[in-house]
Amino acid sequence: MLLLAGLALLAVAVLHAQILGGLGAYLVQAGPPQTADAALVLAGDGWGHRILTAAQLARDGFVPKVLVSGPDGAYGLHESDLAIPFAVKHGYPESYFVRLDNSARSTVTEAQAILPVIRGMGIHRLVLVTSNFHTRRAGAIYRRLAPDLTIMVVAAPDQNFTANGWWHNREAQKTFLMEWEKTVANWMGL
């Protein structure tokens, strides 16, 4: 028994990068850009990677418009109040963007607030743009709540999290643990 425990510990020590990398890679489920009726920038990226990724999809002709989720937040501003000017400052025309202000506090409540608006706009093919670590869970939530829509997911890079190496960065470690907590909670219907 002690020998088996020792061998298991040795295997974990030798294979830890593969195991941890596999757990990180599981969170990332995204594909290459495809044409759609619109891109939807999910809230929660204070660095601008999501909106710039979506704006580039519009510039490259994959989508005619970029819907920007804008939960209310700090100092009476919606996230879209900051995100859209940020993208414009980076050279994208303001005409690309459509604000979707809301008061969501989670990916589920964001989808519940936004999906009726999207359906009302006549959108049938939607590209979700979110951070790499958030792609699997966000895609699953939107597909579950909108089986009538074709949902594709494009990953925006995260400045800290990479699937292979997240354990070397403190911020990425926190991101990994938080996303796994939310993934398990989603599996449990919480």
Protein language model regions, located:
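N-terminal Sec-pathway targeting helices
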Residues: 1-9
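A structural signal for short, hydrophobic/glycine-enriched beta-strand patches
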Residues: 11-168
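A transmembrane-helix-recognition feature enriched in membrane-embedded lipid enzymes
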Residues: 168-190
